[in-house]
Swiss-Prot record:
Cleaved signal peptide residues: 1-21
Name the record gives this protein: Alpha-conotoxin SI
Compartments (UniProt record): Secreted
UniProtKB keywords: Acetylcholine receptor inhibiting toxin, Amidation, Disulfide bond, Ion channel impairing toxin, Neurotoxin, Postsynaptic neurotoxin, Secreted, Signal, Toxin
Highest taxon of source: Eukaryota
Family according to the record: Belongs to the conotoxin A superfamily.
Major localization listed first in the record, in broad terms: secreted
Region of interest (Disordered), ranges: 23-47
Function comment: Alpha-conotoxins act on postsynaptic membranes, they bind to the nicotinic acetylcholine receptors (nAChR) and thus inhibit them. Is active on muscle nAChR (IC(50)=113 nM on adult subtype (alpha-1-beta-1-gamma-delta/CHRNA1-CHRNB1-CHRNG-CHRND) and IC(50)=142 nM on fetal subtype (alpha-1-beta-1-delta-epsilon/CHRNA1-CHRNB1-CHRND-CHRNE)). On mice muscle receptors, its higher affinity site is the alpha/delta nAChR subunit interface. On Torpedo receptors, it does not distinguish between alpha/delta and alpha/gamma acetylcholine-binding sites.
The species this protein was found in: Conus striatus
Intrachain S-S bonds: 51-56, 52-62
Propeptide residues per the UniProt entry: 22-49
Amino acid sequence: MGMRMMFTVFLLVVLATTVVSFPSDRASDGRDDEAKDERSDMHESDRKEICCNPACGPKYSCGR
């Protein structure tokens, strides 16, 4: 392969990697925001003893 062809392949790989990484970054940010949200199910359980998150365990009811 010539230098132009190798450079073109390199640019395509960099571009493809950049395009693929953007949606996964946004999705993880959304999950982080949900986890940090003060009104999440587990945070509500401290005040109302109602939790719809399975991680709360049998101690709390869902209340839905």
